[in-house]
Amino acid sequence: PQAAALHPDSINCIRVATFVKDGEPLVIYAACKAGTGGMAFDNMGRGGITMRFDLDTGKIAGQGHDEELKKYDRHPTTGIELKGYQMPMHEEVKALALKAALMYPEFHYVGWDICMTEKGPAIIEGNDYPGYDLAQIPDDGDPHPRYGLIPRFEKYGIEV
């Protein structure tokens, strides 16, 4: 219900980007995706918004952004305040992404779109090129607007 409340007409996923290094799955970033305006999709390219997501707390960690980089403090359809919004099953979502990454280690960098169901998290798809845009769009007041993903890869000794 909490994930659906964000935008009831779409399946609102958590994108968890993983990288497998030396047989160990690592989380590079996570983002929450939600549809808008009655649409059934959560994709930015079809009118959805995306927000940085903290897998440790299960909370949306920043503003929403659409494909034109318009920023939203509140969901444009439901009016729900985005930053700090608690999504369910974040620990299970993270565990599922790491497990999936180990099942396909030949694909080193994958973005797993995971939805929350009544029976637990479920993978909708794995993207073998999840891109970098979802995690690098700066928020207003972001103390590190040029932070990007390079430090996240370097943290694990991954050359980019």
Regions found by a protein language model. Name each.
Residues 12-14, 107-110:
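Short beta-strand or tight-loop elements
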Residues 28-30, 112, 126:
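Generic beta-strand hydrophobic packing signal
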Residues 53-55, 65-76:
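Solvent-exposed helix/loop surface patches that form functional interfaces
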